[in-house]
């Protein structure tokens, strides 16, 4: 099991000191805001005054540059959290320009992020990022929606080497991760994805991202 740091308000937002402390303790992933992302708050009709902003006046906020440098120096993963597609494009470009090598776009298929397949293809082609595609997305009220058809489409369009199989099984509405992973793998196998490709998406990508 590996740790991570999520840059929500509770962590002080875009707090480079918290990032550095987490990395020195062994964190392997730095997530940009999730619950505190402007996009998340807008879609949940929350208090926008509490948003952790990553873009200001059309530009990446300066605080991100220090965080990018730490991520680069420790050779860990940058996760995009619950940013909007527009924010993701700007952040990914800035992170690549800063030398960040490992970038994961977090569950782009989830309605909270809502990234089109065309944008996912473009991100892969332009920046060679990893797309995290989860088994299901919580819909509220104890319900979830399967992402498997969307995920298969993304694998076919973007290429299996840029799609990471994940579950989001920690969400209370979603199935337990082990059941979700079994169904996910079986679905891919039933729809023409080879054993070698499945292994790559469930093992090799993660091994490389975590420096195992």
State what each model feature region is:
Residues 180-212:
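Mid-to-C-terminal alpha-helical segments outside catalytic/metal-binding sites
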């Amino acid at each position: 099991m590996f740790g991570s740091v999520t840059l929500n308000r509770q962590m002080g937002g875009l707090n480079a000191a918290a990032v550095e402390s987490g990395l020195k303790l062994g964190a392997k992933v730095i997530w940009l805001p999730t619950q505190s992302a402007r996009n998340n708050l807008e879609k949940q009709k929350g208090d926008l005054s509490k948003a952790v902003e990553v873009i200001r006046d059309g530009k990446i906020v300066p605080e991100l540059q220090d965080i990018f440098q730490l991520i680069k120096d420790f050779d860990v993963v940058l996760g995009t959290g619950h940013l909007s597609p527009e924010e993701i494009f700007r952040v990914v470009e800035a992170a690549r320009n800063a030398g960040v090598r490992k970038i994961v776009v977090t569950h782009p298929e989830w309605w909270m992020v809502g990234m089109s397949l065309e944008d996912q293809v473009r991100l892969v082609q332009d920046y060679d990022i990893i797309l995290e595609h989860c088994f299901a997305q919580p819909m509220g009220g104890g319900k979830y929606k399967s992402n498997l058809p969307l995920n298969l489409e993304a694998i076919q369009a973007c290429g299996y080497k840029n799609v990471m199989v994940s579950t989001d099984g920690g969400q209370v509405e979603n199935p337990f991760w082990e059941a979700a992973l079994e169904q996910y793998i079986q679905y891919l196998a039933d729809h023409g994805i080879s054993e070698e490709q499945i292994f790559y998406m469930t093992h090799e990508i993660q091994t490389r991202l975590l420096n195992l």
